[in-house]
Each structure stands twice: as C-alpha cells, then as structure tokens.
Swiss-Prot record:
Pfam families xrefs: Phage_tail_NK
Protein name: Tail needle protein
C-terminal globular knob: annotated segments: 132-282
Protein family membership: Belongs to the Lederbergvirus tail needle protein family.
Disulfide topology: none
Encoding gene per record: 9
Region described as Interaction with tail hub protein: spans on this chain: 2-60
Localization, UniProt: Virion
Species whose genome carries this gene: Shigella phage Sf6
Amino acid sequence: MADSNLNVPVIIQATRLDTSVLPRNIFSQSYLLYVIAQGTDVGNVANKANEAGQGAYDAQVRNDEQDVILADHEQRISAAEATLVNHEERIRQAESTLQDHETRIAQNESDISSLDTRVQSLESQVSDHETRIDALEYATTRKKSEVVYSGVSVTIPTAPTNLVSLLKTLTPSSGTLAPFFDTVNNKMVVFNENKTLFFKLSIVGTWPSGTANRSMQLTFSGSVPDTLVSSRNSATTTDNILLATFFSVDKDGFLATNGSTLTIQSNGASFTATTIKIIAEQ
C-alpha cells in the first residue's frame, strides 16, 4: 500500500536568507555569500526531496494498481489452469473413447467385410436359384396348340394327304396352329426339351352310304414312322373319329431337330368332315 507520508512536502521554515537579515560588519563578504548560498541549496534540496517523495508516492500508487492487476491475472491464470486441467482430462477421456470407437469401427469393418462376403455368396445362390426357378417354371409351363374347325365341309381323300396343308386352308372357330404346327413347312414341330408331347385329333363327319370297310389312318413321319388307325362299322351314320398318341421327346433328338410330317388318308371311301379339333401339348 502506498505511504501517504511520501505525499507530504518538506516545509522550509527559513524562507528568506540574504544580506539584509545578517549582521553587518561581522562576517566577511565571502562568508555572507556562503551563508546565502546555503539557504538556496537547502531550498533546492527540499524541492528535490519533495519531487522524489511525490515520485515515490506515485510509484507506490502505481505499484498498488499493478498489484491489483497482477492479482486479477493470477486469479484468471489459476482459473485458466483449472480449465486447462479439465480440458486435459476431457481430452484424455475423449482419446480413450476415440480409441474404443476405433476398435469398434475396426471390428465393425471386419464384420461388414464378412457380411459382404456372405451377401455376395447369398446373391450368387439367389441368382442360381432364380435361374433354376426360371428353368423349373419354364419346364412346368404347358405349351399347347388347340384349334377347332366347326361348320366346315372338308373332304379327306383316300390318297395320302398332308394334314397341316389341309387344315391351314380352313378358318378356325378358335385357336391357332402355332406353335406346334408349322404351316410353312407343313409339319408338326416340338420344343427341344426332354418333355413328352401329347397329340389328339378328333374328327366328326360321314363316309358315303354303302361303304363297307372304312377307317381313318394318320401316319407320323420319323426314323420309325407311327401310324394310328380308327376303324368304323358300316352301320354307323355319323362317325366320331379319335386319334390320340404321345411322343417321348428327347432334347436334340430326331423329332426335336426334324419335326414330323402328318399324313392322313381315308380308307374305303373319301370322308367328309364337318368338325375337326386338333391338339398338341408339351
């Protein structure tokens, strides 16, 4: 704390010292001048002392102010150090948490990599299953040609006649000859698969009266031709003829690669058909 006494000036009691206040004819002129100079020197010393005291007081006041500032700085530094310690502790905790996170992330990345491998394997299996399912769906999907011709009058002669050539000139009541009956090459074709083909031909019509021995014959061309024959009694007025069979189709086999020509002929007399239904199914 500043000493207030330093702020009190030195007071000189003898404020005037000159030749008028000294005894005359006692001291020499040199001594009188010396005494007068001493008074001046004392005044100068007092002034300097007052200036020094004032400076010392001002310095102590400034020191007191700086002490307050330093105390505030020390307090703030202490608070900052405490905050820094807290920050260091939190940083250590954060680093520990980060290390834990890095460990868990590394584990997760390893798990994800394993899962990616398993997902890729599953995707490959799914793709394989989809391919197999598509194949199974295709294999179990029925392909069929079913055509009905009704209200017609078609003569089936006694000479061998290509059945597809005969049918393609007619207008069907329902259905189409495709895909099993090729109207360009006039033959029956099959899908190149190891699947059985079922065939049925139903014809309604009549032979001329008086025809004794009569039958309908259908031949399928092939390495070993198959022939179907339906015989009818002469007493029957309206004849319902049914010719049905099946073919065990082999992939890349003769029937799959060549198809089969269907040749029909009426034995005994020409046959007039009024309704025809032909079905092929694989």
